Amino acid sequence: MKKLLEGKTPANEITENLKKEIKNLKNDGINPTLCVIEVGDDPASKIYLRVKRNLAKKVGINEVGLHFPADTSQAELLGKIKELNQDPNINGIMVQLPVPPQIDPRAIFETIAPEKDADGFSPLNLGRLWEGQSDIIPATVRSILTLIDYYGIKMAGKNTVIIGRSVIVGKPLAAVLLERDATVTIAHSKTKNLADLTRNADVIISDVGKAHLVTEDMVKDGAVLIDVGMNRENGKLMGDVDFDTVAPKANAITPVPGGVGPLTVASLMKQAVILTRKQHGR
């Protein structure tokens, strides 16, 4: 391994830049405000929300938290989102996932106004990504791009395999990497002979949530690996890539934890500021 793609350093740089940017906005009478909605009491969500709130406070974003009970109907939640869409004091809206089964996440994505879409999941913003016309990007995708740029990884002409086709990571990531002239293949649960694809890949990005999915025999020498997966095995947090065996072959690889993860919340805060600027014609 020539390069460890750790995310803490670029995340800290984003945080410091956001502090300065938000201070300047506040000096002009603009107070970036992000509304974070939680439905139910998912333990993992509680932890992630705490991290979001702490960083929002640190950089100077006004975070408005709304909590709904687990039995909240979809209609009630969507009604509240529509109210927030019309509130000029709210610049960004996000709903913490997962939500209870009676609520369809797609309905949430379709209801949040694109100009207040902090997560970057609205159909309009995702469509604009495919046209190369949007800087509203899902936070995990922005985190991956930040790592790519921070460490000077050139994507043009690179055979790139994305493992995972979610609307949150895989599909929008393919869109932005195509804009960077990468040759992109998306693999998923029905893909046959995954190893044949990854062995020819210059860059492998995995977002599946399956430990030891990508092993040493599936990776060519000098490949770049970006691991978005999160798994817990025997009390240890790990990604999709079998780090210990793959790292010696890789030109660059992200650790888990400490790679993409530290950047995701910082990327969300950056998006809230982008939305605020757009709403104020900045």
UniProtKB/Swiss-Prot annotation:
NADP(+) binds at residues 164-166, 189. The keyword NADP applies. Its EC number is 1.5.1.5, 3.5.4.9. It comes from the Bacteria. It catalyses: (6R)-5,10-methylene-5,6,7,8-tetrahydrofolate + NADP(+) = (6R)-5,10-methenyltetrahydrofolate + NADPH; (6R)-5,10-methenyltetrahydrofolate + H2O = (6R)-10-formyltetrahydrofolate + H(+). The keyword Cell membrane does not apply. Keywords: Amino-acid biosynthesis, Histidine biosynthesis, Hydrolase, Methionine biosynthesis, Multifunctional enzyme, NADP, One-carbon metabolism, Oxidoreductase, Purine biosynthesis. InterPro entries: Aminoacid_DH-like_N_sf, NAD(P)-bd_dom_sf, THF_DH/CycHdrlase, THF_DH/CycHdrlase_cat_dom, THF_DH/CycHdrlase_CS, THF_DH/CycHdrlase_NAD-bd_dom. Disulfide bonds: none annotated. GO terms for cellular component: cytosol. GO terms for molecular function: methenyltetrahydrofolate cyclohydrolase activity; methylenetetrahydrofolate dehydrogenase (NADP+) activity. Pathway: One-carbon metabolism; tetrahydrofolate interconversion. One of its GO terms (biological process) is L-histidine biosynthetic process. Homodimer. Belongs to the tetrahydrofolate dehydrogenase/cyclohydrolase family. Catalyzes the oxidation of 5,10-methylenetetrahydrofolate to 5,10-methenyltetrahydrofolate and then the hydrolysis of 5,10-methenyltetrahydrofolate to 10-formyltetrahydrofolate. This is Bifunctional protein FolD. It comes from Lactobacillus gasseri (strain ATCC 33323 / DSM 20243 / BCRC 14619 / CIP 102991 / JCM 1131 / KCTC 3163 / NCIMB 11718 / NCTC 13722 / AM63). The gene is folD.
